[in-house]
From Swiss-Prot:
Domain of life: Bacteria
Source organism: Ehrlichia ruminantium (strain Gardel)
Biological classification of the source: Bacteria, Pseudomonadati, Pseudomonadota, Alphaproteobacteria, Rickettsiales
Pfam families: Ribosomal_L33
Name of the protein described by the UniProt record: Large ribosomal subunit protein bL33
Record-stated family: Belongs to the bacterial ribosomal protein bL33 family.
The keyword Ribonucleoprotein is annotated on this UniProt entry: yes
Cellular component terms (Gene Ontology): cytoplasm; large ribosomal subunit
Listed GO MF terms: structural constituent of ribosome
Length: 56
């Protein structure tokens, strides 16, 4: 079996406050800043900024 890599799963939460989120893989060795993407929020029905939070 293959080794488990160093990638982490992180939650990208909507800044619109709708509670909608995406789950993304992240390599902590390469990225030191928090991830942020402008993606579609179907609850708000528009593109908003999604920022990284810890996945629990």
């Amino acid at each position: 079996m293959a080794k488990r890599g160093s990638t982490l799963l992180v939650k990208l939460a909507s800044s619109a406050g709708t509670g909608y989120f995406y789950v993304k893989k992240r390599n902590p060795k390469k990225l030191i800043n928090k991830l942020s993407f402008r993606k579609y929020d179907p609850v708000a029905r528009k593109h908003v900024l999604f920022t990284e939070e810890k996945l629990r």
